[in-house]
């Protein structure tokens, strides 16, 4: 950035102060680039908790979460666009036991990626408002919904891609509004009482290249296209929470870009 100098010469400032001259130099304004804040549970970084890093984050920052288990409820509610990026969804875990939700999102254009979100009393991810981006997450064993796009606080939408949404108490993915701004692609939604749900059956949700299996009801008021499959994803060890795909899984190479359906 070029240094700019502001020279202001003021003559005859007042009848009291005659011949007064003012010379000021303004320093260039530095526009700081978006940064990366690192969280680790072993005191090897500045931040021990995700919430502490988010408190220090600015618009456009990435909060990178090292492997470990984080027992907290995470809220991204300020007017900042944040990327919350886990190192590995198999080993980077937010355990929200006794918390309402593992992650709460408000405002536009936040991204959540590479995490396991589990054991919340209600929702794994609660989108209260705005357009959000959720990818490569395992969302499991939450008391109510895996992902809830609410309509109480405003308009909540999301692009949900390459997620594994399993064994939640009521619903895998619940979109209160049936709107084409919500896109669900390349996800496994399995072993929930209801799989993908909307409250406004207008046929607008985009639901493509997903695998649904073992839900009490796969679709509730949702109109999928024929790119979705209803087959056992063949998890490596479901009983122990290993949702990687075994050899021969119908999800291998079956995604929209010939990648795997699901997180792994």
Describe each model-derived feature in a short phrase:
Residues 20-56, 67-69, 87-88, 233-239:
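Right-handed parallel beta-helix/beta-solenoid
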Residues 43, 67, 81-125, 230-238:
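Right-handed parallel beta-helix/beta-spiral solenoid domain characteristic of secreted/periplasmic
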Residues 54, 73-77, 101-106, 123-129, ...:
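Glycine-rich beta-solenoid repeat tracts in large extracellular/virion proteins
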Residues 64, 75, 85, 95, ...:
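Extracellular beta-strand solenoid repeats
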Residues 65, 82-86, 110-113, 132-135, ...:
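All-beta strand scaffolds that present successive hydrophobic residues in beta-strands
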Residues 69, 88, 116, 138-143, ...:
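A structural signal for beta-strand register positions
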Residues 109-174:
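Right-handed parallel beta-helix
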Residues 226-264:
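C-terminal accessory segments
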């Amino acid at each position: 950035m070029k240094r700019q100098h502001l020279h202001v010469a003021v003559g005859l400032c007042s009848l009291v102060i005659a011949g007064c001259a003012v010379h000021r130099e303004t320093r260039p304004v530095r526009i700081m680039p978006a940064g990366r804040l690192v969280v680790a549970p072993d005191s090897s970084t500045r931040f021990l908790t995700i919430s502490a890093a988010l408190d220090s984050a600015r618009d456009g920052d990435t909060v990178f979460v090292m492997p470990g288990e984080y027992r907290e409820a995470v809220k991204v509610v300020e007017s900042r666009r944040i990327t919350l990026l886990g190192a590995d969804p198999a080993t980077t875990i937010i355990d929200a036991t006794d918390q309402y939700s593992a992650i709460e999102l408000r405002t536009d254009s936040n991204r959540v990626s590479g995490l396991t979100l589990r054991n919340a009393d209600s929702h794994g991810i609660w989108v209260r408002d705005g357009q959000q981006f959720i990818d490569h997450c395992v969302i499991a064993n939450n008391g109510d919904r895996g992902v809830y796009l609410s309509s109480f606080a405003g308009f909540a939408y999301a692009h949900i891609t390459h997620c594994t949404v399993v064994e939640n108490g009521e619903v895998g993915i619940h979109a209160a509004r049936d709107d084409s701004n919500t896109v669900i692609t390349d996800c496994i939604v399995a072993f929930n009482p209801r799989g993908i749900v909307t409250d406004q059956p207008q046929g607008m949700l985009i639901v493509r290249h997903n695998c649904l299996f073992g839900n009490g009801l796969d679709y509730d008021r949702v109109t999928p296209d024929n790119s979705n499959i209803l087959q056992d994803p063949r998890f490596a060890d479901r009983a122990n929470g290993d949702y990687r795909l075994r050899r021969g899984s119908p999800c291998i190479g079956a995604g929209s870009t010939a990648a795997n359906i699901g997180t792994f």
